[in-house]
UniProtKB/Swiss-Prot annotation:
Signal peptide: none annotated. Residues 93-156 form the S4 RNA-binding domain. GO terms for cellular component: small ribosomal subunit. SUPFAM superfamilies: Alpha-L RNA-binding motif (SSF55174). It comes from Rhodospirillum centenum (strain ATCC 51521 / SW). Keywords: Ribonucleoprotein, Ribosomal protein, RNA-binding, rRNA-binding. InterPro entries: Ribosomal_uS4, Ribosomal_uS4_bac-type, Ribosomal_uS4_CS, Ribosomal_uS4_N, S4_RNA-bd, S4_RNA-bd_sf. The keyword RNA-binding applies. Residues 25-47 are annotated as: Disordered. The lineage of its organism: Bacteria, Pseudomonadati, Pseudomonadota, Alphaproteobacteria, Rhodospirillales. GO terms for molecular function: rRNA binding; structural constituent of ribosome. Pfam families: Ribosomal_S4, S4. This is Small ribosomal subunit protein uS4. Belongs to the universal ribosomal protein uS4 family. GO terms for biological process: ribosomal small subunit biogenesis; translation.
Amino acid sequence: MSKRQEAKYKIDRRLGVNLWGRAKSPVNKREYGPGQHGQRRKKPSDYGMQLMAKQKLKGYYGNIGEKQFRRLYQEAVRRKGDSGENLIQLLERRLDAVVYRMKFAATPFASRQLINHGHILVNGRRVNIPSYTVKDGDSIEVRSKAKQFAFVMEAAASGERDIPDYLSVDSQALKGTYVRAPGLADVPYPVQMEPNLVIEFYSR
């Protein structure tokens, strides 16, 4: 197992949830955290529930750093409308999230690696910033060279995940379009996400 896989599954174990719905997640075998006292789960406090909601969202999107995640919260609150919905939209506009949703990569971690190495084009131009904000109508494509990578082809052919309807994707060409921003109900999370609890956490 690679170090990246180990880190990913460590997140699952620590949070006690199968964040990405993966068959090999250790949570499928036991639903408690790591360590000697992992089975002793108390009923969480309001703060504990808010913290868990934050950790799940941060972890799901590839363990986003605290400073970056706080900036997303601040932007979500600044915008009009429901702050929790705004937060989800901001997260789903990240280029690494879009590449993952389009099934050009099997995990958010692999998506980030693909972008960092310059293998993703946005509107025909190379973008190597995973946090890049994708806009409605933007075209996302895997570079020609990377289309032959085994892990890219395997991800695109996988039947484990469906592509959500706020994206339009040609899986053969490994090219897609960001159609619109999703609401929370549109996003195919394998586990329940509670962005409003995240807003409450930072609003304390």
